[in-house]
């Protein structure tokens, strides 16, 4: 019964718990959940789904809705999950350890949702050695699709040749995107 209700929440169909994104900004999500408006420090549509699932689970377990939303509004992103780092010159870096092409695409789509147009998106993509070689070129292609500049690195090469890792990643970089792509070993 619980899993059925939660699956309804995530399907964008009629459900016991409803959520609407009012604003998705770098400062967080402004949402209406079951007619209560609340600000969350997390960003991105995927986090809105996660928040709604947590809310629904807590309510089904008997918690008070206002208390649940208050607690959830104080949540911070896990380290390395769209984590914001700012410097004293007003530059913002978002760190995310996306480790699949789909995850990287979702992160970059999220960032592009709240860009005003003047910012430059520079994406650093590292792939470790002795890991899934098939995703290397796909991650590079995703980075090139959504970014003004791309920096490819071999991260932790382990027993692999760092240059070979970068060669694999460059297979996902089209000829037209090579000028905006930098390799660093």
Residue ranges of each PLM-predicted region?
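Extended acidic/charged loop-beta regions that coordinate divalent cations
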Residues: 1-37, 78-81, 85
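Short internal beta-strands
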Residues: 2-5, 122-125, 148-156
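Short, conserved catalytic or adaptor-binding loops enriched in Gly and charged residues
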Residues: 8-12, 84-87, 142-143, 171-176
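A short helix-to-beta-strand connector/capping loop
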Residues: 15, 88-91, 175-182
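Class I S-adenosyl-L-methionine
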Residues: 32, 73, 112, 167-174
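Nucleotide phosphate-binding/pyrophosphate-handling subdomain across enzymes
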Residues: 36-149
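C-terminal helical cap/extension that packs against the catalytic core
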Residues: 140-185
């Amino acid at each position: 019964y619980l899993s059925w209700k939660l699956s309804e929440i995530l399907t964008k169909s009629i459900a016991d718990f409803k959520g609407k994104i009012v604003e998705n900004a770098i400062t967080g999500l402004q949402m209406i959940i079951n007619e209560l408006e609340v600000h969350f420090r997390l960003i991105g549509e995927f986090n809105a789904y996660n928040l709604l699932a947590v809310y629904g689970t807590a309510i089904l377990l008997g918690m008070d809705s206002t208390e649940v939303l208050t607690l959830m509004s104080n949540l911070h992103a896990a380290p390395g999950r769209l984590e914001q780092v700012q410097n004293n010159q007003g530059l913002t870096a978002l760190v995310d350890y996306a480790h699949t092409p789909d995850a990287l695409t979702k992160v970059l789509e999220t960032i592009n949702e709240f860009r005003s147009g003047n910012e430059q998106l520079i994406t650093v993509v590292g792939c470790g050695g002795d890991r899934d070689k098939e995703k290397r070129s796909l991650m590079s292609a995703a980075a090139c699709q959504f970014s003004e500049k791309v920096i490819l690195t071999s991260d932790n090469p382990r027993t692999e040749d760092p240059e070979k890792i970068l060669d694999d990643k460059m297979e996902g970089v089209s000829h037209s995107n090579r000028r905006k792509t930098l390799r660093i070993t």
